[in-house]
Amino acid sequence: MLNDVYAAQKDGCEKAIASLKRDFTTLRTGKVNISILDHVMIDYYGSMTPLNQVATVLASDASTISITPWEKSMIKTISGAIQAANIGVNPNSDGECVKLFFPPMTIEQRQENAKHAKAMGEKAKVSVRNVRKDANDEVKKLEKDKAITEDESKKGQDEVQKITDGYVAKIDALVKEKEAELLKV
């Protein structure tokens, strides 16, 4: 019974970590990452479609993203969608593809992104703590229903806290690693 509670808690915490890693991909570091365009949606024959489903998106070098649409008629639509997404660059089109040139990041931009990384880490910790609360509530419910003893309940809550501490430490390590990457010039 308690093992089910622990498994559910670990699953919830893993989801929080996965969400944090996904959020980190939206932060720009020294080199461009094509995942910055993951949220860009294109009006493709009346339905909103992710950019990567209508074009090939590649990082040409450390500061350039090249977008080659599968249909040349989509170039104007893609350029408009990128401008509307407000990612901090203007698209340049040569008739064949759309290129995005990212200027080098300033120290202020790097520090701002490091702050965002910290805030994302705090949000993930809140998620982990909410999962802990749910797990503790489940342990207390088992005790109330006489499925486990008071001692087992106490041990169960201690184990829930150990699991939480482990995941909070993982989040702290991920945030520290991301901050170092962001602040590295």
UniProtKB/Swiss-Prot annotation:
Residues 135-159 are annotated as: Disordered. One of its GO terms (cellular component) is cytosol. It comes from the Bacteria. InterPro entries: Ribosome_recyc_fac (IPR002661), Ribosome_recyc_fac_dom (IPR023584), RRF_sf (IPR036191). Keywords: Cytoplasm, Protein biosynthesis. The keyword Protein biosynthesis applies. One of its GO terms (molecular function) is ribosomal large subunit binding. GO terms for biological process: cytoplasmic translational termination. It is found in: Cytoplasm. SUPFAM superfamilies: Ribosome recycling factor, RRF (SSF55194). Pfam families: RRF. Its main location: cytoplasm. Transmembrane segments: none annotated. HAMAP family: RRF (MF_00040). Belongs to the RRF family. Responsible for the release of ribosomes from messenger RNA at the termination of protein biosynthesis. May increase the efficiency of translation by recycling ribosomes from one round of translation to another. NCBIfam families: frr. This is Ribosome-recycling factor. It comes from Campylobacter curvus (strain 525.92).
